[in-house]
UniProtKB/Swiss-Prot annotation:
Quaternary structure note: Homodimer.
Cellular location(s): Cytoplasm
Protein name: Proline--tRNA ligase
UniProt-listed SUPFAM superfamilies: Class II aaRS ABD-related, Class II aaRS and biotin synthetases, YbaK/ProRS associated domain
Domain notes: Consists of three domains: the N-terminal catalytic domain, the editing domain and the C-terminal anticodon-binding domain.
Keywords tagged on the record: Aminoacyl-tRNA synthetase, ATP-binding, Cytoplasm, Ligase, Nucleotide-binding, Protein biosynthesis
One GO BP: prolyl-tRNA aminoacylation
Protein task: Catalyzes the attachment of proline to tRNA(Pro) in a two-step reaction: proline is first activated by ATP to form Pro-AMP and then transferred to the acceptor end of tRNA(Pro). As ProRS can inadvertently accommodate and process non-cognate amino acids such as alanine and cysteine, to avoid such errors it has two additional distinct editing activities against alanine. One activity is designated as 'pretransfer' editing and involves the tRNA(Pro)-independent hydrolysis of activated Ala-AMP.
Keyword hit for Protein biosynthesis: yes
Matches recorded under PANTHER family: MITOCHONDRIAL RIBOSOME PROTEIN L39/PROLYL-TRNA LIGASE FAMILY MEMBER, PROLINE--TRNA LIGASE
Amino acid sequence: MRVSKYLLSTQKETPANAEVISHQLMLRAGMIRRNASGLYSYLPTGLRVLRKVEAIVREEMNKAGAIEILMPMVQPADLWVETGRWDKFGPELLRFKDRHNRDFVLGPTHEEVITDLIRKEVSSYKQLPLNLYQIQTKFRDEVRPRFGVMRSREFLMKDAYSFHLDVDTMNETYEAMYQAYSNILSRMGLAFRPVLADTGSIGGSMSHEFHVLAQSGEDLIAYSTGSDYAANIEKAESPMPTEARGSATEELRLVDTPNAKTIAELVEQFGLDITKTVKTLIVKGATEEAPLVALIVRGDHELNEIKADKLDLVASPLEFAPEALIRDAIGAGPGSLGPVGLNMPIIIDHSVSVMSDFAAGANQDDKHYFGINWERDLPLAQAADIRNVVEGEPTPDGLGTYAMARGIEVGHIFQLGTNYSKSMNATVLDENGKSQVLLMGCYGVGVSRIVAAAIEQNFDDRGIVWPEAIAPFSVGILPMNMHKSHRVTDIAEQLYKDLSAAGIDVLLDDRKERPGVMFADMELIGIPHTVVIGDRNIDAGVFEYKNRRTGEKQDVPFDQIVDFLKNLQA
């Protein structure tokens, strides 16, 4: 490709409304342009990257035995009513009527459509197992689209759906998809971690997320320093206490604490050890008999809302009680709450169950109890894992301790079971002629999100530093003063032809432009390899090669340059 015949829409200035580096660089590198909130057009450079990501995803899915199809983005509302998600999904589901007053949606996902398709097309166990995928545009009407294509309303996604009659083949397909996703991200040259995850709104049992590691990642990943264990912070298991509860050494006493509204203030003002304090949080209960439930974690720990949401006594989705309701039920507000004398179900974290001589709110404004002890001052409450893990704690496999990293979720695989097939009556006849409800798996990759995540992991102060496999071009040719030197022109043109013939994606900057601008554009768009041609190089019979990632420069003889660049791509 010649720059003179290409739309290279680079910008010097960083756009003011771009919050994260990937959004900034995708705009500056001329990859995308905003049409409306959460809606973007891909320019040639951006589309080249997107298509390379898409090609790797497609190759690995095909290699894993999945079959490509294509389903409509517009879906009939009847299918969503059938599964109950018409009412459950919320405002992210964009609904509209056609000219015949029939309800439709713009698909944020395709479980309903694929299940409807399979129940009509598959009738016998002989047709199973089956794994179908598509690479299709999705639309979610995000309340606040952010971060460019990282969280846009319209995005490109690969979604696959597998169908089974038995758990064994469902597990086999799940493992195949796990490996395919690992292959996809490895081939793209990205540092990533597969992590145990919550199944979220889609539902199901087994679930893993695939995270590209980046400091800007929204998700916190807890991983083992001694094994492959990793989990989203929402899912990471807290270790059970190994120590026994200490004996009481203090008397229970009521203390005035007028200026201590938080744990931090309480600890500072009274010189307490934060591990000897607890936080009491009031949430709505699941039953009329227990409309409120108290959740208690140690003062230095954080409540894990996903874990709390799964407790039988707690209403789902988790909802914290408003202050007015708390005051009406307890007589005190947040900041002065505690377990002593509390007349509602109490669930404590396992770490709280072994505490002694601890401090908590007294359920009176501006007062706390110090020296609280279980089974002396109050019965030992029901214990559960309801907190986030902490760095340095032992991991569940016993092979290391927790460390933390931030990640950007780019893939998610689920075992859905019969969540959709049962509600939509998707059945087949088994080998005994009996009707059986299909088991399902669901496997998604954010194709456009990978592009942004790759940038978040690969950039410097000059621009993007693309991994080889997904760079818009592999090689950039920079002829110095091409329009003033016939020698430079002839050699640049010949190198362009030779590299193109060798199957290398090459961009020849044939503009009448200053060298500084040419170098800046090549570095901004992140081309991995640059070849500089000037009269001085020609006199020496060499090209000047520069590696974008390392900054390394070296002279390469004319007759060796093609093989040299091909070997770098191998």
